[in-house]
Amino acid sequence: MSLEELDNEEMVEKYRLYTLKKILFIVMCIIAVVVVIGYAATIGSSDISAIDVYRDIWYHFIDPIKCDETIDWAVFDIRLPRIIGGLIVGSCLGVAGAAMQSMMKNPLADPYTTGISSGASFGATLAIGLGITVTGSAGSLGLILTAFFFSLVPATVIILVSSLRNTSAATMILAGIAVMYLFNACTTLIKLGISDESLSAVFQWSVGDLSQVTWSNCAIMCLFTLAGTAILMAMSKKLNILITGDKNATALGLNAHRLRIALLIIISLMAASVVCFTGIIGFIGLVAPHIVRIFLGSDNRYLIPASAAFGAVLLMVADLVSRVVIAPTFLPVGVITAFIGCPMFLYLLIKQRRTMW
């Protein structure tokens, strides 16, 4: 066997081990999700062991007759909607953040870069403070739909601006920032004229909350998350090419501008679908993809699913901490995501010597 053949075999083996490492990371995150679900479901006013939780989940789907009615009610009607909601939201923001960073070629990008959070906040403030909704009626449905509608307005503005000329990623970011400041100013003006009770409700919504998530909410968020993730996975190779630069993408037959617009639409719909139900939960879409990228690199074929799994773990753990740190009072989950994610991210960033991009 020649020296060249030996080198080729060694390279193939290294690539195989590197791929295995990526798959193992995703599997470990999935196992962590299962463990966190079991433990989080034990936290509440009534004591339920983790074994009882797993048993109830098993019997609930396999043999419902064997379920303890009290435990089943506490687990499936009270605790699991919030837990599964955290899983879906964390996955959605992780995927959207990974795609946004790759699309924009900007390590500071996240799902809210295009102004989605400010648009949603404006819509929620309109609904809560002034009772103005897109449905014409007050209530949770009006709030959700109004927040969803206005969260998509900034992305629509960016798309319209981009249609006038082939704008770069930097221009799209700047347009998003401009719209964000406009919506923030409008939101502040509304807050100046609403009651203290409404102002408190707006604040609670703006810091992110999983406690009001229902199974129907989970179903809608899951639909957007699964569909968006599947489409982004199908586009992952094109996204890898886009990272190398618009000129290289064009040379390989890709229309970088159209691809970026398509990605922006998908990411915006994913982020809007969770923000309208849970409020603004920050840091997940920024930190989760970064941490995954440190371990697995920037190949979106693995980065996207790994960011989904790690984002779910990160948000579920943050929500768990928010429920127990000063129980029975709940801290805003957005505060905990920052406290957990920021030190973890800084530590890994300082420790990591090789470039991630």
Residue ranges, per PLM feature:
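Alpha-helical transmembrane segments in inner-membrane proteins
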Residues: M1-W357
